[in-house]
Amino acid sequence: MGPVMLDVLGCELDAEEREILQHPLTGGLILFSRNYHDPAQLRELVRQIRAASRHRLVVAVDQEGGRVQRFREGFTRLPAMQAFSALNPSAEAETLAQQAGWLMASEMIAMDIDISFAPVLDIGYGSAAIGERSFHEDPAIALQMARCFIRGMREAGMKTTGKHFPGHGAVSADSHKETPRDTRSEAEIRRHDMPIFQQLIAERALDAIMPAHVIYTEVDPRPASGSSHWLKTVLRQELGFDGVIFSDDLSMEGAAIMGSYAERGQAALDAGCDMILVCNNREGAVSVLDNLPAMEADRVARLYHRGDFTRQQLIDSSRWKETSVALDRLQGRWLNHKAAAGR
């Protein structure tokens, strides 16, 4: 399996995409809203992807909930992660978070999708890129909510991806549009943002981690996604993380500081990433495939899903029906809450 995860343009594969999926460096594919029309079409697209690739790819999506949910019509509308603790007593919030993790993962696995890049482990709501995607501004509450969500994901058969290490919650800039800079000291980042990652790693609750396209100016001039300090020294050696490290999308403006697409890809791999994402730029993805040396990304094969059920079996189950109703109710309460607050 190769170390490159890329995307496709539409709701079915074209000839060039079939060729790209055969490339030995291709190891994964991420789906977006543009790849979705309805559940039957999505399942057929994933079947085409599986058939076109020379080995089993890791098929991924961002189906977190709230504003980051690529597939909407035909799937349960998941509330933003902030909604669990913001609107419910702690015990009920924990139950809902676990059920949401289970339902999200189950709905994706029924489509033969391996992973959703979740959960978000960033602390606080101040970042434009994160906001309500964060479980809470209190690290202890965020940790407990994340534990519950992870428990649900794993119960369904999906591996977990914690993001965005070492923490994206304190910067207001959006790394999709620019390169955010976090000017806090390393000691402050370690005290406030990193403990949730550290604890979940110690509990072996994270199968993968995605670092932030953020420059922590007091620590390293490179974004964390291209920093051997953050990925090798801190994450691998100090925290003992043995799972998969993904780069975030190298097409994002936050990664542009690392050079051309090929240079960004090589920098992320040299820094310690196992798999690099190159999305929304076909020319950039082809440049990466054409210029990287041959290599394998063996760790990534650990991320295949373990579910064995159809969509019909899932939606016929009493658990899905009850959970879908509960989450839909919470989503309605959350939208009303935001409207009342003028958000």
From Swiss-Prot:
Plays a role in peptidoglycan recycling by cleaving the terminal beta-1,4-linked N-acetylglucosamine (GlcNAc) from peptide-linked peptidoglycan fragments, giving rise to free GlcNAc, anhydro-N-acetylmuramic acid and anhydro-N-acetylmuramic acid-linked peptides. InterPro entries: Beta_hexosaminidase_bac, Glyco_hydro_3_AS, Glyco_hydro_3_N, Glyco_hydro_3_N_sf, Glycoside_hydrolase_SF, NagZ_Beta-hexosaminidase. This is Beta-hexosaminidase. The record marks D174 as: Important for catalytic activity. Belongs to the glycosyl hydrolase 3 family. NagZ subfamily. Its main location: cytoplasm. Residues 161-187 are annotated as: Disordered. One of its GO terms (cellular component) is cytoplasm. It comes from Erwinia tasmaniensis (strain DSM 17950 / CFBP 7177 / CIP 109463 / NCPPB 4357 / Et1/99). The active site is at H176, D248. GO terms for biological process: carbohydrate metabolic process; cell division; cell wall organization; peptidoglycan biosynthetic process; peptidoglycan turnover; regulation of cell shape. It catalyses: Hydrolysis of terminal non-reducing N-acetyl-D-hexosamine residues in N-acetyl-beta-D-hexosaminides. Substrate binds at D62, R70, R133, K163, H164. GO terms for molecular function: beta-N-acetylhexosaminidase activity. The keyword Cell division applies. It is found in: Cytoplasm. It comes from the Bacteria. Pathway: Cell wall biogenesis; peptidoglycan recycling. Residues 174-187 have a biased composition (Basic and acidic residues).
